[in-house]
């Protein structure tokens, strides 16, 4: 196992003193934060809180125009390199996608929808995640109009997901019907997040 964490493997661009093992720990920390966000979202959305409130409770407030959020990110990352893996939009998006995939998997098992539709939905979810990540990365590069384009593309993909979800018959069980309701709520939250971030990107002073 030590060979897998070789300190000499592609470490040329690592922060001073960081080894490959440090980076693996960093990756695991990001995954823990994503899982935490998913749990906080699942509990608090049922209590009627909106995504902005939930993100703040989870320690990952949604960035607003002009925020220096990279200096105020979760305390667990405060002394570590700033990368996409500890970007609030990345953590929030991955957390929401995790919730979406969990509920969708259960609904698919209950309703036995066609493999073609399952593939279409899965592919579009992946494309949405891709555009959301590009949007966050573009913001970090100060390419705000590019970020806006990526967030708008993500919103388009979420519209496609909504259309595909409408093809799924309402599950017979009460639990299945509730999962469908939650799936639609998650997609709505993701879409609203994309639209808000696109608007924030357009509102930045250098784009006026």
Model-inferred region functions:
Residues 1-208:
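Amphipathic alpha-helical assembly/interaction segments
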């Amino acid at each position: 196992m030590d060979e897998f964490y070789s300190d000499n493997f592609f470490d040329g661009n690592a922060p001073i003193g960081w080894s490959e093992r440090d980076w693996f720990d960093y990756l695991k920390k990001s995954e823990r934060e994503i899982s935490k966000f998913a749990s906080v979202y699942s509990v608090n959305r049922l209590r009627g809180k909106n995504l902005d409130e939930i993100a703040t409770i989870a320690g990952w407030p949604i960035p607003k125009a002009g925020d220096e959020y990279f200096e105020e990110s979760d305390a667990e990352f405060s002394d570590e390199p700033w990368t996409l893996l500890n970007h609030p939009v990345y953590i929030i998006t991955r957390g929401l996608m995790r919730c979406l995939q969990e509920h969708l998997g259960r609904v698919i098992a209950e309703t036995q929808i066609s493999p073609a539709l399952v593939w279409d939905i899965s592919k579009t979810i992946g494309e949405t995640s891709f555009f959301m990540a590009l949007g966050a990365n573009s913001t970090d590069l100060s390419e705000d109009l590019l970020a806006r384009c990526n967030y708008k593309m993500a919103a388009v993909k979420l519209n496609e997901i909504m259309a595909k979800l409408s093809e799924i018959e309402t599950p017979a069980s009460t639990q299945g019907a509730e999962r469908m309701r939650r799936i639609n709520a998650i997609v709505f939250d993701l879409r609203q997040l994309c639209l808000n971030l696109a608007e924030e990107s357009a509102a930045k002073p250098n784009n006026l």
